[in-house]
Amino acid sequence: MAKKITGYIKLQIPAGKANPSPPIGPALGQHGVNIMEFCKAFNAKTQAEEGTITPVVITVFADRSFSFITKTPPASVLIKKALGIESGSSVPNKNKVGKLTKDQVKEIAAKKMPDLNAASLETAMKTIEGTARSMGVEIV
């Protein structure tokens, strides 16, 4: 029989940089999970993308064991990385912070495809373009 699930924890942690300080420590501590064990496992799994924000869903079981699934980085993080900018525009309709080519959008959409609710690469590209526009990035 499968283990009884007591909860899910969703966090966004920089890859390879999980440590027991907040927000990770308190979130895992209240479910009775071994915090250092999670940090070591997460850092080992994500060391290839060092520093990139990585969403993780942790499943906590009744015996205080856990499993976790890492997702692809948020689209906004991938867009900022592609353009080399620190943040999006505070007024996206007026101030543009950069230009993203269709090829860059396609590359980001392909990377995000497993986590997007899109049937094809074209619809995934439209989702990424919408995120980029809301950040004040032009699509060329």
Curated annotation (Swiss-Prot):
It comes from the Bacteria. Pfam families: Ribosomal_L11, Ribosomal_L11_N. Part of the ribosomal stalk of the 50S ribosomal subunit. Interacts with L10 and the large rRNA to form the base of the stalk. L10 forms an elongated spine to which L12 dimers bind in a sequential fashion forming a multimeric L10(L12)X complex. GO terms for cellular component: cytosolic large ribosomal subunit. Forms part of the ribosomal stalk which helps the ribosome interact with GTP-bound translation factors. The gene is rplK. The keyword Ribosomal protein applies. The keyword Membrane does not apply. This is Large ribosomal subunit protein uL11. PANTHER family: 60S RIBOSOMAL PROTEIN L12 (PTHR11661), LARGE RIBOSOMAL SUBUNIT PROTEIN UL11M (PTHR11661:SF1). Belongs to the universal ribosomal protein uL11 family.
